From Swiss-Prot:
Organism: Encephalitozoon cuniculi (strain GB-M1)
Residue spans crossing the bilayer: 54-71, 75-92, 104-121, 125-147
Keyword Iron-sulfur belongs to the record: no
GO cellular component terms, A-Z: Golgi apparatus; membrane
Descriptive protein name: Uncharacterized membrane protein ECU02_1470
Domain of life from the UniProt record: Eukaryota
InterPro entries: Prenylated_rab_accept_PRA1
Mode of membrane association: Multi-pass membrane protein
Compartments in which it is found: Membrane
Signal peptide start and end residues: none
Main localisation: membrane
Length: 156
């Protein structure tokens, strides 16, 4: 139980840091800092530094794109419901007809439900994978191109 409370406090602190520092948000949207990396090592360094510094912004961008796509393809709400029901049943272990559901049974039922969903709604899943790939490409491109000002952070 202690671990859960500690994780919640850490999560809240991270959210406050991400939202409280206006310089980070300004740096994220500052197109004046965009420049092509000199070599592959410079690109890797930038990507790792920017992914660490702007993780909340990249996560928010991905969540917004995904939410827009879910609103466009409403059948994905069924998938969200299947996953949510599976997580709930796995954690709570409800009783159905005087039989307690085991985690193994819940995982198998969830897998079968998701598989059936994939069979009937192929286009929605392909679109979701395309959105994921697009977000990954945009994130890595932004992280690799955003360069100036990183030297100040590295020296501190």
């Amino acid at each position: 139980m202690q671990g859960g409370i500690q994780e919640e406090k850490t999560f809240q602190r991270n959210i406050k840091e991400a939202l409280g520092d206006k310089d980070v948000t300004r740096d994220f949207f500052n197109i004046g800092r965009i420049c092509v990396p000199q070599n592959l090592n410079d690109a890797k360094r930038r990507v790792f530094a920017n992914l660490d510094r702007f993780k909340f912004h990249y996560l928010a961008m991905t969540a917004i794109f995904t939410l827009i796509y879910v609103l466009y393809r409403l059948e994905l709400i069924i998938l969200i419901g299947i996953v949510a029901a599976g997580v709930y049943a796995y954690r709570v272990r409800p009783t159905v007809c005087n039989i307690e559901l085991e985690p193994r049974s819940v995982c198998i039922a969830g897998f079968v439900g998701i598989l059936i969903f994939f069979i009937f709604f192929k286009e929605a899943i392909v679109g979701l994978l395309a959105i994921s790939a697009l977000c990954g490409i945009v994130t890595l491109t932004h992280a690799a191109l955003l360069g100036e000002g990183l030297q100040k952070d590295d020296e501190v």
